[in-house]
Amino acid sequence: MNTGHGTGQQIHPIVRVPFSAGVPLIEATFAARSGQFLVEAQMGGRMVRAHVADRGRLVDLLVPGARLLLAPREEVGRKTAFQVVAVYQDSDLVSLDTQLPNRLVAAALSLRALPQFARYGTVQREVQLGPHRIDFRLSEGLDTCLLEVKSVTRVIDGVAVFPDAPTERGSQHLELLTNAARNGQRAAVVFIIQRSQGVAFAPDETIDRAFSRALRTARALGVEIYAYLCPVTPTGITLGHEVPVFMSLSAVPSELRRRL
């Protein structure tokens, strides 16, 4: 289970951030996926093409008839006039804005709303470490912490899971954090669950066995692993409460799933 502090309904400053698009969103209906990053959608009686930034397979979310929230985009050189920022799964709004988790964590760190990292006064973003970049480097004097953020959108039987597609980059980030922890450096990963439903977090070994292995190794060697359930509305995302972390779906107690 989680190697960090306790889980549950923590009291912290309210942290909300808007969608990256920064414009009013338009509702549309998903019709088909025409490429890894392209979708066709019905909007106001016409078909439109929209870009989706999330690299996951999204097979549970992007189903015919699903309600989408699109942001109009007019940047020069764009091939699509719209960006998919969220999708409804039943009544649960799920963010597909890949920039939102890092922006949420950055805001939470600035407000010291994450108790695990509240002692750090300096926050550096996108820190280069060899060939890779780590999302945050936190410091207070000589005390430092490397922090990586991952976006979670998929839920299986009430458990939020990651990844939604094989991620060699994700495994490399975990290996980097593991090496840092092995050398005495504090290191952590925070999984931001971009939806309001989910009672726990676990890696999905059926999608990426290597990532699941790397996560177990990271935890065993001192990398701290946290997961936060972060409700999404049409205006943005809010930092919610921490949920317990397990190293496999089968390890999640059935009584915990029944709380959903």
Swiss-Prot record:
An example of a Pfam family matching this protein is SfsA_N
From the UniProt record, list the coiled-coil ranges: none
Molecular function per GO = DNA binding
Q: Which InterPro entries did the record assign?
A: SfsA, SfsA_C, SfsA_N
PANTHER family of this UniProt entry? Answer: SUGAR FERMENTATION STIMULATION PROTEIN A (PTHR30545:SF2)
Q: Which family does it belong to?
A: Belongs to the SfsA family.
- Protein name per its UniProtKB record: Sugar fermentation stimulation protein homolog
